Regions:
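Cytosolic-side membrane-entry/anchor segment at the start of a transmembrane helix
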Residues: 1-21
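Intrinsically disordered, low-complexity regions
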Residues: 10, 21-24, 39, 128, ...
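Membrane-water interface of alpha-helical transmembrane segments
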Residues: 1-2, 47-49, 113
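A structural signal for well-ordered alpha-helical scaffolds and beta->alpha junctions
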Residues: 6, 57-61, 147
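A residue-identity detector for tryptophan
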Residues: 8, 35, 74, 120, ...
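Transmembrane helix-loop-helix hairpins at the membrane interface
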Residues: 80-217
């Protein structure tokens, strides 16, 4: 946890430096840069919209993750690898990592870097920092870049960083809990050794080539 505090602290400092030198806020875009500013001039209204978009993005991403892990082999393998890499985490540590990563990474990537590099390049860089030791982790990198693109578009649309931060926290919190609690290997093993259901009382069984009622026990 100590290393994470240092890394996130450095990211926050870098974000504040980048935005401070340009006289900008790391939490919102200038009105003329937000795509919806013409239709929704009030920042409070755009912030509320940003929050709604963030909650929706977070919920959809969490649901998609669970569906992919339970229905595709590549996602299941990735889940197993990430689970081994992360190890056991308490609820408090999950909450800590979800909040600190969600706030810090969004302030740095969307709040500070995106106005300089643009939505697409920032999303690619966001994906590039989510890499693993082997090719199994490639979908994780691509997924992170895709989510970064959605977060970036949300920020550019509303001009408020609240939605991307909330979405990031929701995704990390829910998916870390899922990562720790769900073990596909154990589930698959239990399914293979589950005995067949016993013959129902009154069902017919074949004996000596003819069907006879099963004897109740």
């Amino acid at each position: 946890m100590g290393a994470a505090v240092v890394v996130y602290g450095l990211l926050t400092a870098a974000a504040l430096l980048l935005t401070g030198l340009r006289g900008r806020s790391p939490l919102s875009l200038p009105t003329d840069e937000a795509w919806l500013a013409g239709a929704i001039p009030a920042l409070t209204m755009r912030t509320a919209l940003s929050l709604a978009i963030g909650l929706g993005l977070g919920a959809c991403a969490v649901r998609a993750t669970k569906l992919l892990v339970t229905r595709t082999r590549w996602a299941m393998r990735l889940h197993v690898e990430l689970r081994a890499m992360v190890g056991p985490l308490s609820g408090a540590r999950i909450a800590f990592f979800a909040v600190t990563s969600g706030v810090t990474e969004e302030i740095f990537f969307r709040g500070a870097l995106q106005p300089l590099a643009g939505v697409w390049l920032t999303s690619a860089l966001f994906g590039a920092v989510h890499v693993g030791p082997n090719r199994t982790f490639l979908p994780w990198t691509l997924w992170a870049a895709f989510m970064g693109l959605l977060f970036g578009l949300s920020y550019q649309l509303t001009g408020s960083l609240l939605g991307p931060v909330v979405a990031h926290i929701v995704v990390n919190y829910a998916n870390l809990h899922y990562l720790v609690s769900y073990d596909p290997v154990t589930v698959a093993r239990e399914r293979r050794i589950t005995p067949e259901a016993p013959t129902l009382v009154g069902a017919r069984v074949r004996t000596s080539g003819r069907s006879t009622p099963a004897e109740p026990r």
